[in-house]
Amino acid sequence: MYVHHLFLRDFRNYRRLDLALAPATTLFYGPNAAGKTSLLEAIFYLATTRSPRLSSDRELVRWDAVGEAGTPPFARIAADVERRIGPVRLEVLVQRRADDDGQPLNGAQKLVRIDKRPARAIDLIGQLRVVLFTPTDLTLVDGPPAERRRYLDITLSQLDPHYVRTLAHYQKILLQRNSLLRAWREQRRVPRHVDAELAYWDQELAAAGGYLLAERLRAIVELNDLAGPLYQEMSGGEDRLQIEYAASCDLGTARDAGGLAERLLLAFAAQRSDELARGQTLCGPHRDDLIFTVAGINLGRYGSRGQQRSIALALKIGEAGLMRRRSGEAPVLLLDDVLSELDAQRRAHLLALIHHPDQQTLLTATDLSDFSADFLAAVRRYRVEDGQVFAG
């Protein structure tokens, strides 16, 4: 799998870009704020429908972009992707919102096309699989639980169309259930009506949550197999890394979706009074976490910076291995100025992944001196300056 062509219009600081890409390694270099990261962001967005940097799509549209025929400005991101199952054209238009008088509103709207046919944003996910490495990956280890849930969800959503749809369904049900719990707490609903409605939402949430849990637990088994030995090598012979799934409720020994759904129903019943008092759902996949241990020590809490960096890198390389193992194709690797952050040993492990046959890697750097002459001779290079890309 690789991106054959990337097209941008009014995206970030790019007015226009039409760039052919090789199926091997491409290095984009140049000063900060030149647009290097935006190239990787565009490809990540096509794969996941979200930016790794922003909460609002509105900011993706170039600040001085002009709309056509009185319409609000928009950004266009498109790519031709070569895959084992056949080529595909992916395209997203992100348009700023405006009122009837043309005055800007908050937010943006998306128009998605797959092979030039209109599609839903959710249908885009999994058409192109990517793994993004950034200097902020350390938050996977020492950041809040939401970062680790997001890591799992992005990985599994790209591999399993049913997972991403179930995740979206779960989030909608969760909003409904929380709204009902708050209504009871604020005495806006009759208690007997709340009980009947909660019974319905409990069943719906448990069914969706059971599937999410089953897939997450299966992925953790595989990630332990892939990332555990990598950490051991990078750390110079420390004990093997163990990734533990820290569920917010007692799952018992259940591992299949049906059994896990039953465990969730039991947990909802046990926590009913607390949930009604607090007005929120207190257990489920939306509150779970990952714990990283070596020799029984929680390295997310007590590990050194070097240990935590090794865990983050092992997780990302493990993510790429999981995608290759399940799909039979290597994902596109996006490395945003990360090699300069790594010591020689960690860099060697990442370069070994880059040099794997059939692996497309797109990486950015500010300084070519971070790379050996042999590496620079083996890759395609582009200089990025002020939203323009030049060969060499």
From Swiss-Prot:
It is found in: Cytoplasm. One of its GO terms (cellular component) is cytoplasm. PROSITE patterns: RECF_1, RECF_2. Gene3D superfamilies: P-loop containing nucleotide triphosphate hydrolases, RecF/RecN/SMC, N-terminal domain. The keyword Membrane does not apply. Signal peptide: none annotated. PANTHER family: DNA REPLICATION AND REPAIR PROTEIN RECF (PTHR32182:SF0). This is DNA replication and repair protein RecF. It comes from Chloroflexus aurantiacus (strain ATCC 29366 / DSM 635 / J-10-fl). The lineage of its organism: Bacteria, Bacillati, Chloroflexota, Chloroflexia, Chloroflexales.
